[in-house]
């Protein structure tokens, strides 16, 4: 019996390896289309989807990165989110960085152009307080920074008014200054789904 199984196992293993990974829980509608259909469907256009409109604007304005996407468009997967999280942790730069919408857009555009992931995966739970990633596997949460720390960081400086830390949460609905914090437990536990199961009804 074992002999019969061992003969067919290499073909099965190869088929499993070639099967596309499913989209991670919590990704947007376009990534769900990419996972199900292998392409963006007509239900997600620049007119109906904010992420498509944003990406189209980046392409038309040629703002950001000079390279075009280097690999085919694909949805963010659990493994992709975990790998990207640990890559950014190892290389440094994101952990502890003050969050702003512009910085998120720069990261999304870089990931889109270098890895091919459609930029609808970096979404967070609503505030106030810690914002957990909706995409399972993304190990960066947004943590509020104490206003006194903001003042200490800016002490003696008068030329950084546009720096995100100086905006005192002006972009945030809760008026909180947020920073990205790496949390490896987010690779094992989907806290956003536990706190907000209503966000995952259509997944």
Curated annotation (Swiss-Prot):
Q: Where is the segment annotated Mediates dimerization, Nef-PTE1 interaction?
A: 105-121
Region annotated Acidic, chain positions: 59-62
Recount the UniProt induction comment for this entry. Answer: Expressed early in the viral replication cycle.
In terms of superkingdom, the source organism counts as Viruses
Task: Indicate the principal place this protein occupies in or around the cell.
Answer: host cell
Q: Where is this motif: Diacidic?
A: 171-172
Q: How does it sit in the membrane?
A: Lipid-anchor
What Gene Ontology biological process does one annotation of this record name?
Answer: symbiont-mediated suppression of host antigen processing and presentation of peptide antigen via MHC class II
Q: How is it modified after translation?
A: The virion-associated Nef proteins are cleaved by the viral protease to release the soluble C-terminal core protein. Nef is probably cleaved concomitantly with viral structural proteins on maturation of virus particles. Myristoylated.
Q: Which GO terms describe its molecular function?
A: GTP binding; SH3 domain binding
Site note Might play a role in AP-1 recruitment to the Nef-MHC-I complex, residues: 16
Region annotation (SH3-binding) ranges? 66-75
| Chain positions of site Cleavage | 54-55
- Please report, in chain numbering, the residue ranges of the motif Dileucine internalization motif: 161-162
Query: Cellular component GO terms, alphabetically?
Result: extracellular region; host cell Golgi membrane; host cell plasma membrane; membrane; virion component
Q: Which UniProt keywords apply?
A: AIDS, Apoptosis, Early protein, Host cell membrane, Host Golgi apparatus, Host membrane, Host-virus interaction, Inhibition of host adaptive immune response by virus, Inhibition of host autophagy by virus, Inhibition of host MHC class I molecule presentation by virus, Inhibition of host MHC class II molecule presentation by virus, Lipoprotein, Membrane, Myristate, Phosphoprotein, Secreted, SH3-binding, Viral immunoevasion, Virion, Virulence
Does the UniProt entry include the keyword Disulfide bond? no
PxxP (motif): residue ranges? 69-72
Q: Where is the lipid attached (N-myristoyl glycine)?
A: 2
Q: Where in the cell is it found?
A: Host cell membrane; Virion; Secreted; Host Golgi apparatus membrane
Its biological purpose is as follows: Factor of infectivity and pathogenicity, required for optimal virus replication. Alters numerous pathways of T-lymphocyte function and down-regulates immunity surface molecules in order to evade host defense and increase viral infectivity. Alters the functionality of other immunity cells, like dendritic cells, monocytes/macrophages and NK cells. In infected CD4(+) T-lymphocytes, down-regulates the surface MHC-I, mature MHC-II, CD4, CD28, CCR5 and CXCR4 molecules. Mediates internalization and degradation of host CD4 through the interaction of with the cytoplasmic tail of CD4, the recruitment of AP-2 (clathrin adapter protein complex 2), internalization through clathrin coated pits, and subsequent transport to endosomes and lysosomes for degradation. Diverts host MHC-I molecules to the trans-Golgi network-associated endosomal compartments by an endocytic pathway to finally target them for degradation.
Quoted from the entry, the domain comment is:
The N-terminal domain is composed of the N-myristoyl glycine and of a cluster of positively charged amino acids. It is required for inner plasma membrane targeting of Nef and virion incorporation, and thereby for infectivity. This domain is also involved in binding to TP53.
Q: What family does this belong to? A: Belongs to the lentivirus primate group Nef protein family.
What else does the entry mention about this protein? HIV-1 lineages are divided in three main groups, M (for Major), O (for Outlier), and N (for New, or Non-M, Non-O). The vast majority of strains found worldwide belong to the group M. Group O seems to be endemic to and largely confined to Cameroon and neighboring countries in West Central Africa, where these viruses represent a small minority of HIV-1 strains. The group N is represented by a limited number of isolates from Cameroonian persons. The group M is further subdivided in 9 clades or subtypes (A to D, F to H, J and K).
Please give the subunit comment from the record.
Answer: Monomer; cytosolic form. Homodimer; membrane bound form. Interacts with Nef associated p21-activated kinase (PAK2); this interaction activates PAK2. Associates with the Nef-MHC-I-AP1 complex; this complex is required for MHC-I internalization. Interacts (via C-terminus) with host PI3-kinase. Interacts with host PACS1; this interaction seems to be weak. Interacts with host PACS2. Interacts with host LCK and MAPK3; these interactions inhibit the kinase activity of the latter. Interacts with host ATP6V1H; this interaction may play a role in CD4 endocytosis.
Protein name, as recorded: Protein Nef
Gene encoding the protein: nef
């Amino acid at each position: 019996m074992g002999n019969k199984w061992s003969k067919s196992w290499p073909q099965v293993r190869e088929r499993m390896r070639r099967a596309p990974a499913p989209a991670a829980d919590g990704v947007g509608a376009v990534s769900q289309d990419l996972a199900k259909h292998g392409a963006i469907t007509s239900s997600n256009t620049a007119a109906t989807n904010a992420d498509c409109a944003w990406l189209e604007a980046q392409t038309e304005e040629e703002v950001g990165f000079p390279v075009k996407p280097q690999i085919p468009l694909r949805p963010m997967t659990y493994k992709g989110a975990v790998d990207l999280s640990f890559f950014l942790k190892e290389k440094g730069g994101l952990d502890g960085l003050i969050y702003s919408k512009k910085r998120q857009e720069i990261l999304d555009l870089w990931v889109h152009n270098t890895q091919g992931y459609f930029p609808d995966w970096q979404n967070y739970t609503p505030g106030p307080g810690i914002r957990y990633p909706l995409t399972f596997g993304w190990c960066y949460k947004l943590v509020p920074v104490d206003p006194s720390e903001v003042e200490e960081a800016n002490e003696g400086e008068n030329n950084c008014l546009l720096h995100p830390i100086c905006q005192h949460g002006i972009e945030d609905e809760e008026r909180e200054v947020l920073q990205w914090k790496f949390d490896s437990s987010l690779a094992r536990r989907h806290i956003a789904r536990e706190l907000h199961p209503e966000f995952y009804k259509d997944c």
